[in-house]
Each structure stands twice: as C-alpha cells, then as structure tokens.
C-alpha cells in the first residue's frame, strides 16, 4: 500500500509546477529537443534539467539522447497510468456516497 502512495506522490508531483505544466503542454504536440524547450520557456539549463528529472521520474515523460541533446516526449503508458491514478483517487464507491451524512452530529 505504501509503495502505491509513493507512486501517486511521484506522479502528482509532476503536475505541481507551472513550468512542468508548460513543458507538458509543449510535449502534447510531439517530441521536443531540450534546446527547443529552453528557448520556449526562457529558463536556464539547470532549471530545465531539474523539471525534466521530475517529469521523467514520474513516468509521464521519457527522454531520448541524440548527440549532446536529449529529446523529450510524453510516454503513453505513463500518461495512462497518471490518468488511472487520478481517477482512482477521485472515485467514490456507492457505499462512500451513501455514508456521506452530516458531519460531527450536525444535521
């Protein structure tokens, strides 16, 4: 159970930063070289590396080294897993819906 929460935290962390959300938006149109991401985002190399590590560790993004640059793209399996984890967290079972009565003895 603990490892599932660790996975969720790792995946959800990928979505908790404006720069990472911008990177994900850029990658929706296809693979991008790190040089293009640097140009689009107007951030430094070390900042981009930090964000790409978090995105790759989450499984949502994958990198492919070509020469001195890394090319990044969305990982279909990783994005499907992120969607599954989010749906799992937000889903209420029918029992949970029925149990949602007044809180703390209130009416």
What spans do the regions from the language model cover?
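Alpha-helical residues within the helix-turn-helix
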Residues: 39, 56-57
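Amphipathic alpha-helical dimerization/coiled-coil segments
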Residues: 2-7, 76-107
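Residues within the DNA-recognition helix of helix-turn-helix
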Residues: 51
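Mid-chain, well-packed structural core segment of small domains
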Residues: 57-58, 66
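N-terminal helix-turn-helix DNA-binding core of bacterial DNA-binding proteins
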Residues: 6-47, 66-79
């Amino acid at each position: 159970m603990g490892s599932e929460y660790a996975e969720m935290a790792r995946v959800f962390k990928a979505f908790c930063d404006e720069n990472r959300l911008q990177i994900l938006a850029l990658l929706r149109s296809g693979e991008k070289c790190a040089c293009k991401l640097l140009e689009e985002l107007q951030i430094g190399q070390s900042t981009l590396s930090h964000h790409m590590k978090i995105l790759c560790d989450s499984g949502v993004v994958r990198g492919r080294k070509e020469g001195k640059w890394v090319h990044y793209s969305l990982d279909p399996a990783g994005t499907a897993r992120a969607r599954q984890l989010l749906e799992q967290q937000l889903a209420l079972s029918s029992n949970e819906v029925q149990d949602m009565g007044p809180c703390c003895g209130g009416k």
